[in-house]
UniProtKB/Swiss-Prot annotation:
Gene Ontology CC annotation, any one: cytoplasm
UniProt xrefs under Pfam families: HSP33
Gene from which this protein is expressed: hslO
Family listed: Belongs to the HSP33 family.
Record-given protein name: 33 kDa chaperonin
InterPro entries (UniProt xref): Heat_shock_Hsp33, Heat_shock_Hsp33_C, Heat_shock_Hsp33_N
GO biological-process terms attached to the record: protein refolding
Gene Ontology molecular functions: protein folding chaperone; unfolded protein binding
Superkingdom of origin: Bacteria
Annotated SUPFAM superfamilies: Hsp33 domain, HSP33 redox switch-like
Known role: Redox regulated molecular chaperone. Protects both thermally unfolding and oxidatively damaged proteins from irreversible aggregation. Plays an important role in the bacterial defense system toward oxidative stress.
Length: 290
C-alpha cells in the first residue's frame, strides 16, 4: 500500500515528507499504457502533487500542470487531501534512454514551459501560481515552485524506477523544509547531508524505501513520525458526470450523435474509462432538457 510519512526533527527546525508511491504510478502506467520516459514524467508529477496535497487542509483540490513545449506536451494531475490522485500525459509514447547506461531521460525533452498549481479551497476563488520550468526534471521544478511561490526553501527528490521491461518497479520521493527558527548552523548541516545523500534511485531501491529516505534525511539526528497516511491513484469520474457534460451541448450536436454515430462514447482523460451512451440515452438527455 502506498503511503506518505510526515516527520519533524527533534529540534522542531525541519520537517520531511517521504512517500512510497509505487502502486500509484503502476496504476497510472497501466491505465495510460505509457512508455518509459512518459511513465517517469507522469509519475514524478503525480508524486509532486501527492506532496502538495498532503500539505493542504480541509477538502481542497490541487491541480498541477507541467506545461512543456517539447515531446511530452502537457502533464495534468489532480489530487485531494484524502490521498487520492489522478493524472494523464498528452504524449504517452516518449521512450528515450541514454545509450550507454539505459537511463530514462525526461528533462532534455520537456522543453521550455511552466509549472502551474491551482489550489481550489471550495470557496469559488481558486489560487493559481505559475513558475518557469528550471530543468524539466520536475523535482527541481517543484522545489523552485515551493521556494518562489510558497516562500519556503525546500529540497525535493522524486523518481520512478523501471524494470528491464520498462514496467514500474518502485516510485516515491521526499520533501525537506526548514521551519521558522532553524539556525544557520542547522540549515548548513542539513544542506550538507542532503548534498551527500545517495541518489534517490538508490534509496528507492532499498528494502524499505521510506526508512531509507528518513535515515538519509536525518542521519544521526533524532526525529519524530507525526503521521502515516495512505495514497492511491483514484479517479472520481462517473457516467452521471459525463451525462451532465452532454446536457450542456446544443441539441443539434446531440441529434448529430444520434443520426450519424448512433450513440456516443466518452473516454475519461484521467483514467481511460469508457462510457457508452446509446441513442435512447441521448434522446433522453434531449427530452430532459426540453
Amino acid at each position: 500500500m502506498d503511503k506518505i510519512i510526515k516527520s519533524i526533527s527533534e529540534t522542531g527546525s525541519f520537517r520531511a515528507f517521504v512517500l512510497d508511491s509505487t502502486q500509484t504510478v503502476k496504476t497510472a502506467q497501466e491505465k495510460h499504457q505509457t512508455l518509459s520516459s512518459s511513465t517517469v514524467a507522469l509519475g514524478r508529477t503525480l508524486i509532486a502533487n501527492q506532496i502538495l496535497a498532503a500539505n493542504q487542509k480541509g477538502d481542497s483540490k490541487i491541480t498541477v500542470k507541467v506545461i512543456g513545449d517539447s515531446s511530452f506536451g502537457h502533464i495534468i494531475s489532480v489530487a485531494d487531501t484524502k490521498g487520492h490522485v489522478k493524472g494523464y500525459i498528452q504524449n504517452t509514447g516518449v521512450d528515450i534512454k541514454k545509450t550507454a547506461t539505459g537511463e530514462v531521460l525526461v528533462g532534455p525533452f520537456m522543453g521550455n514551459g511552466h509549472f502551474v498549481t491551482i489550489i481550489d479551497y471550495g470557496t469559488g476563488n481558486p489560487y493559481t501560481s505559475t513558475t518557469p520550468l528550471i530543468t524539466g526534471e520536475i523535482g527541481e521544478d517543484f522545489a523552485y515552485y515551493l521556494t518562489e511561490s510558497e516562500q519556503t526553501p525546500s529540497a525535493v527528490g522524486l523518481n520512478v524506477l523501471l524494470d528491464e521491461e520498462d514496467k514500474v518497479k518502485v516510485a516515491g520521493g521526499f520533501m525537506v523544509q526548514a521551519l521558522p527558527g532553524a539556525s544557520e548552523e542547522e540549515i548548513a548541516r542539513y544542506e550538507k547531508r542532503l548534498q551527500e545523500m545517495p541518489a534517490i534511485s538508490t534509496l528507492l531501491a532499498a528494502e524499505d524505501p521510506s526508512d531509507a529516505l528518513l535515515s538519509a534525511i536525518y542521519g544521526d539526528e533524532g526525529y519524530k513520525r507525526l503521521s502515516e497516511d495512505s495514497l492511491s491513484f483514484q479517479c472520481d469520474c462517473s457516467k452521471d458526470r459525463f451525462e451532465s457534460a452532454l446536457m450542456s451541448l446544443p441539441n443539434t450536436d446531440l441529434q448529430d450523435m444520434i443520426d450519424q454515430d448512433h450513440g456516443a462514447e466518452i473516454i475519461c482523460q484521467f483514467c481511460q474509462t469508457r462510457y457508452q451512451f446509446s441513442e435512447d440515452d441521448l434522446k433522453g438527455i434531449i427530452n430532459d432538457k426540453a
